[in-house]
Every structure is written in structure tokens, then in C-alpha cells.
Amino acid sequence: MYKLAVCTLLILSVTAIDVTNSVWTSHDQKAFAQIKQSGWGNFILNFGELHLQTGGILAELNTEIAKLIDELDEELAEVHHQYARRTDVHNREVSRLEQEIQDKEREVFNAHDFYDNVLIPQRDRFAAQLEQLQENIAQNRRTLNEATVQRANDHAEFESQVAEHNEAISAIDESLQLLSQLESPSLVQIQKVQKNLTKIQQSLKRHSTFQTFIKTLLEIAVEANFADQGALREILTAFNNLRVQLVDSLNQLTADEAEAQKDFEARVIQLNQEHAEFQRAVVVKTAEIEANANKIEQTLDLIDVLHADLDTLNGQLQAENDDYAFATDVYNATVSEYNKELNAAHQALDLLNQPRFTDYVKSQLKGAF
């Protein structure tokens, strides 16, 4: 229809209705002013004038122009239809994109929440636990080292006390041997016994348990008459009693040392077992820390991807809104243009059916002849 209309308008462009003709009222002239703004209005008036000038029937003219107006109405209806379809597509697309954006925002929130409230606290907790395990290992080794040093010191003390006891027992045995041979002891022999007692006292000076007994024994040895067999037996008995006590003490020292060594070895086993457990726990915790670090990296990558996806969706939504806004502007402009043309067409058709238009055509024909 547009091609036909353009061709016809080109043909009719050489003709124009004389709006200053006396047949037109002021209202008609206002209508002409509005119609002139419309290509279709001008076309209908010029077409109507030409049709009537060539002997056409007004009823036929009305029919043809009505068909043209109907075609305009159909085209406008198609514009409305296409815009309605575009609106449906737009609404569905916006609904889809907004739902996807909402879902993506929820994914972004969940990813950030998982990172902030799970992975980071877990990382800090694992680091603190690993630090505690390493401190436990260090403390375990310090405890073992201290126990080893203490055991060595205690054993050295044991050996020192054993040497002291053996030295004292040896002196006692020597004194007993001397005393057993005495019948009429000489001053030299008595002094040797007294010297042995002093030696015993020096050997056992750290053992207060024996000091009082040895001191008493020294006093007896100094004051006793070794020629007196009763006094001699008393001294022998005292020496033997002291020897028994020293042997008992030595046996107790040996038993205590064996028990201490046994306890130490058990403690070493326990500490080494604890150390092995700590080491295994470090391996496990290190693996957990590595897994946590990998998960943090994956989550940060996921957050980047989700943000990129969200930006893409927002971009698509903005593009759709912009495209629809442009389509709406085009639609409104098109509808406005069609309405203007239809309004002008109806006004032109109304003028064509006025008796004044027929009078105008007749006057134009008379003027031509």
C-alpha cells in the first residue's frame, strides 16, 4: 500500500486544493491546516478532487477511501500486535533474568558467607591447633631431655653413694679384722682403728643417719680399754651393727636405683609415644590446613565467577530494558503518527462528503472552461 500511496502522492503533488476559495468556511480552513500536516490527509483530498473532476461517483470515492483508512487501521492494529508480542517477550525475559539474578545473588551471598563464617574461622582454628601441637612436641622433647638429665644426675649420685658405702664397709671390715686379732693391742693398732673410724665418718658425712652412731662409736673407741675383752666385744658388736646398717642401706640404694631406672624407662616410652601421636596429629592437621587453603582458593575463584555471572546477567537485563525502551519509543512514535494520519484521513473524508467540496470541484471545473 505504501508504494502505491507514494506513487499516487507524487502524481497528485502537482495539484493542490485552493483553500482560499470562497466556498470554504473558517472551520474548513482550520481543518485544511490540520490535514496539510498529514500526507494521507492531503492525499485523500487531492485524490477526492481528482476523482470527482474526472466524473467519479462520490459513493465509490467513499468506498475506496474507507478501504485506505481500513488498511491504516489494520497496519496500526499490527503495530499494536507486534508491540504486544514484544512486551510479552520482554516481560518473560525480564522475569527470567530477574529470577536468575536473584538466584545468582543468593549464590554469591552463600559463597561469601561460607568463606567468611566457615573457611576463615576454620583456617584460624587449624593454625592455632597446629601451633599448639608444635608447642606440645617441643614441651615433650624438653620434658624428655630434663628427665634424661635428671636420671643421669640421679645415677651419678647413686654411684657416688655406692662408692661411699663401699669405702665405709671396707674400713669397717679392716677394723673388724684388726680388732679380731687384738689380745694386748698396741697403741699403734688402737690408733689405726680410730683412724678407720674417722675415715668411715668422712665417707658417710652426708648420711646423717649414721653420724650419731659413728660419733658414739668413736667415743667408745677412744675411751675403751682394748685389753678389756668386754669392751672389745662391745666395740666389735658396734662395728658389726654399723656394717649391717651400711649393707642394708646399700641394698636399699641399689633397689631404689633399679626402681628409678625402671620408672625412667617407662617415662621415656610414654613420652616417645606421646611424641609419635603429636607427630601423627601434625600430619593430619597439616593435611587439613592444605585442604582448607585449597577450599579457600576454590571459593574465591567461585566468588569471582559468580560476580562475573551476576554482572553479565545485570548487563543482559539492562540491555533488554534499553532495547525494550527503544522499541517502546518507536512504538509510541509510530502509533502517534498513525493516529495523526487516521485523524487527518477521517477529517479529509468528512470534508469530501460536505456539499461544499462538490461545489468547490464544480467551481474549479467551470473556471477551467
Curated annotation (Swiss-Prot):
Post-translational modifications: Two components are produced by post-translational processing from the precursor peptide.
Presence of the UniProt keyword Cell cycle in the record: no
GO CC terms in record: trichocyst
Subcellular location, principal: other
Proregion residues excised on maturation: 17-55, 190-225
Keywords linked to the UniProt accession: Coiled coil, Signal
Source domain of life: Eukaryota
Coiled-coil stretches noted in the UniProt entry, renumbered to this chain: 56-180, 262-354
Signal sequence annotation: 1-16
Subcellular location: Trichocyst
Annotated function: Structural protein that crystallize inside the trichocyst matrix.
Family classification: Belongs to the TMP family.
Protein name: Trichocyst matrix protein T1-B
Organism: Paramecium tetraurelia
Gene coding for it: T1B
